[in-house]
DNA sequence: GGCCCTCTTTAGGGCCTT
């Protein structure tokens, strides 16, 4: 079951509530960010009406016959996915059991795996064009995915992810300043009362977290102080080194998926596909390295740590 | 950019992220 925010609005929110889990229903029903989407939709033709915000991936020319077929032709701009209903399985059972055994931290911590697609590799000049995240505990409405409108910044690496300017530079695709409060609401909906969030990304310290911090700063937001940032790449390197000390095995997400014989859903270098894969890889890594939740917390960074390093580098 | 490795440490190349 896959629910897009635009579909929620189209269906009338109050009648939709009974089918949602309570937390997500609560923030959707009361969300000011949803009003933002409505205003934006209304501004397209000056009429106040709900619209479905889909972006067609059907393309003409060099790319994407393959991609379009894989993605099913269209994808919603922003959506929260009921992964539990979609997969009919508990994909992270082992980690859930381990979290449950850690009685103190498991009551406080929400682990969310994330991935970004961007207009390029430069941390300062490029922009985010797609975000996906998944609460590793699974359950209903645990997954978030959205395209992001980068404004005037051109996409020069569409050959990597297949996302082109004409797909995201559209009025119905939210800009980052509109999206941040929506993303914050999603994270809050997964958060335990008075708890902390561990955001996991592959090569996050050098890439994803720097992009997020820059975008939050640009839009006059701060990364919440109860967020911990965990880079899964050092875990992968440590694990692969322990597997084969004399030969340097690749620690890329793709190589890890091959090593663990994991199947990818969707296309590589699309945020949701990478998040679903990293969620599985992350679980395998924590098991192989015998890392407790406490161990993981000790390996986390804070946004202020990374911001300070970025500022130091900027001066240098 | 940050990290790791080595033919290193007063450095440089490769990996990983898009």
Swiss-Prot record:
Belongs to the exonuclease superfamily. TREX family. DPD1 homologs are present in flowering plants but not in moss, green algae and animals. Its main location: plastid. Mg(2+) 2 binds at residue 115. Pfam families: RNase_T. Residues 1-63 form a transit peptide. Highly expressed in mature pollen grains. Detected in flowers, senescing leaves and roots. Exonuclease required for organelle DNA degradation during pollen development. Plays non-essential roles in maternal inheritance. May be part of the DNA salvage machinery. This is Exonuclease DPD1, chloroplastic/mitochondrial. Disruption phenotype: No visible phenotype. GO terms for cellular component: chloroplast; mitochondrion; plastid. Residues 112-282 form the Exonuclease domain. Gene3D superfamilies: Ribonuclease H-like superfamily/Ribonuclease H (3.30.420.10). The gene is DPD1. It is an enzyme of class 3 (hydrolase). One of its GO terms (molecular function) is metal ion binding. It comes from Arabidopsis thaliana. Keywords: Chloroplast, Exonuclease, Hydrolase, Magnesium, Metal-binding, Mitochondrion, Nuclease, Plastid, Transit peptide.
């Amino acid at each position: 079951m896959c629910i897009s925010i635009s579909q929620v609005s189209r269906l009338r929110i109050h009648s939709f509530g009974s089918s949602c889990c309570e937390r997500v229903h609560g923030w959707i029903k009361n969300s000011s960010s949803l009003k933002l989407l409505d205003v934006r939709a209304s501004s397209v033709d000056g009429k106040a009406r709900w619209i479905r915000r889909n972006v067609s991936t059907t393309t003409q020319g060099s790319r994407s016959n393959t991609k379009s077929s894989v993605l099913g032709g269209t994808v919603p701009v922003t959506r929260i996915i009921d992964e539990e209903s979609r997969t009919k399985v508990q994909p992270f059972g082992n980690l859930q059991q381990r979290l449950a055994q850690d009685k103190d931290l498991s009551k406080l911590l929400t682990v969310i795996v994330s991935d970004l697609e961007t207009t390029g590799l430069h941390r300062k000049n490029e922009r985010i064009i797609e975000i996906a995240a998944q609460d590793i505990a699974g359950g209903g409405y645990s997954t978030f995915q959205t395209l992001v409108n980068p404004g005037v910044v051109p996409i020069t690496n569409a050959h990597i992810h297949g996302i082109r300017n004409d797909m995201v530079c559209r009025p119905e695709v939210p800009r980052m300043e509109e999206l941040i409060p929506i993303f914050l609401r999603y994270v809050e909906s997964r958060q335990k009362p008075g708890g902390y969030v561990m955001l996991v990304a592959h090569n996050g310290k050098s890439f994803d977290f720097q992009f997020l911090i820059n975008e939050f700063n640009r839009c006059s937001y701060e990364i919440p102080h109860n967020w911990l940032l965990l880079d899964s790449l050092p875990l992968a390197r440590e694990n692969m080194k322990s597997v084969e000390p004399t030969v340097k095995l690749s620690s890329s997400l793709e190589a890890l998926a091959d090593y663990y014989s994991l199947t990818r859903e969707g296309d590589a270098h699309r945020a949701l596909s990478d998040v679903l894969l990293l969620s599985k890889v992350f679980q395998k890594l924590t098991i192989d390295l015998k890392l407790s939740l406490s161990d993981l917390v000790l390996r986390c960074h804070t946004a202020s740590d990374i911001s300070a390093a970025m500022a130091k580098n900027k001066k240098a």
